[in-house]
Amino acid sequence: MSTDIFSICAKCLGDESRIKMIKQVNGDECRQCTRPYTIYRWGNRKQGNKTIICITCARARHCCQSCLLDITYGIPTDLRDTALEMAGLEPLTKSANPTNREVKAIMADKLETKFKEQQERSNDILSKLAEKLNKPEEKKTEVAIDVAKLAKKLPFGNSLDVQKYPDMTTFFVFGFSSDFPQAIFSRYAEQYGKVESVVFSSVSGCGFIRFEKVSSAVGFAKSIAENGLNKNKSIAGLLILENTPMRVCFGKQKPLPRTAADQRKLNTVVTKVMKQLASKSKVGVVVKTKPNVYKALSEDYEE
């Protein structure tokens, strides 16, 4: 199959010698650039797979169109770029967040060229990183425990109180659906100032956004807190974009799960917390409970 048509990793394609693919021209909007793109679907009905970003964005990020992992090494692109940055190389996907679709396409082409130029220098670093990350898991129980601990460390209990977090520029965003385009959230945030980074996990249903300036973060926080949907100011603020509800609060950035299984487990926690916050928001007053404590974050979060 020609790489001129799509960019899909071997793991997503599976072990079948023959794969039947369904092609749908302009079937959806790319989650990265929001331009219409050709969707490819394959697999059976129970475990069907599909591409979720366009070929231009996939080539620019050097990632799989389905799982969004690095197409060569099978590692998360944000982790890959961090490793390259620490080694003195320019991250492959670190760029501004333009709103114009044509500009995004041009920038995607430039990112693809940049990757080719520094590919030889980065191969050694990424090979070693991939070797460590892709080792078979020895104890699945240990992974589950780590996910539970991570869920407890995520700032679900924080708010949008700018006086409580005067110098913070990072926000925790959670509760959005798996098909919600990151680009829509980025466009909304960019109204309040330059965004330094956006890290979303579609499967987990949560992520982080960081502004360059405190003034931008303050404007962003107030816009959500005062949008008429948030009577209870002591909890994460409710934001609705494109009919998709989500919660936003101040919070330090934490690493999110890398495997699909762990991401689904974290999504279970996110769903439970969203329901609990919905009941609290109806009260409209400060609820007398311990901060940052939710039933969904208990050890039996997998239920």
From Swiss-Prot:
Keywords: mRNA processing, mRNA splicing, Nucleus, RNA-binding, Spliceosome. The keyword RNA-binding applies. It is found in: Nucleus. One of its GO terms (biological process) is RNA splicing. One of its GO terms (molecular function) is pre-mRNA binding. Signal peptide: none annotated. InterPro entries: Cwc2/Slt11, Nucleotide-bd_a/b_plait_sf, RBD_domain_sf, Slt11_RRM, STL11/RBM22-like_N. It holds the Pfam family STL11_N. GO terms for cellular component: Prp19 complex; U2-type catalytic step 1 spliceosome; U2-type catalytic step 2 spliceosome. It comes from the Eukaryota. Its main location: nucleus. Associated with the spliceosome. Belongs to the SLT11 family. PANTHER family: PRE-MRNA-SPLICING FACTOR RBM22 (PTHR14089:SF6). Involved in pre-mRNA splicing. Facilitates the cooperative formation of U2/U6 helix II in association with stem II in the spliceosome. Binds to RNA. This is Pre-mRNA-splicing factor SLT11. It comes from Candida albicans (strain SC5314 / ATCC MYA-2876).
